[in-house]
């Protein structure tokens, strides 16, 4: 599929083989949706450590599928929550940005 903006199936294929791309994207999609739900809950409950850990995990997973913009957003959130004890306005903004970027990525994965 040409014209993909938010992820790179070629990168996934290079790592796991062309025949496994759909399975990997399916797993990533599920993980991302779960992470977004957990981020939302952690934000509401002021669970900074949970936000930090999810960000770290999803940064790596997003890079694996070539979702570099989203990986960068997760990395920013990971760094921003390092040594924080309470959620800040910046944390909320970062999570909002991640939600927006994730929607675009998920739409593209669904169309793939």
Regions found by a protein language model. Name each.
Residues 1-53, 57-112:
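Two-component system phosphorelay core
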């Amino acid at each position: 599929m040409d014209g993909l903006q938010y992820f790179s199936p070629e990168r996934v294929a290079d790592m796991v083989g062309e025949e496994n791309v759909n399975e990997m994207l399916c797993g990533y999609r599920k993980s991302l949706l779960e992470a977004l739900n957990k981020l939302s809950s952690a934000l509401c409950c002021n669970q900074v450590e949970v936000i930090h850990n999810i960000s770290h995990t999803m940064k790596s997973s997003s890079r694996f599928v070539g979702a570099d913009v989203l990986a960068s957003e997760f990395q920013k959130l990971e760094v921003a929550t390092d040594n924080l004890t309470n959620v800040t306005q910046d944390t909320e903004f970062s999570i909002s940005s991640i939600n927006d970027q994730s929607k675009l990525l998920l739409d593209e994965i669904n169309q793939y």
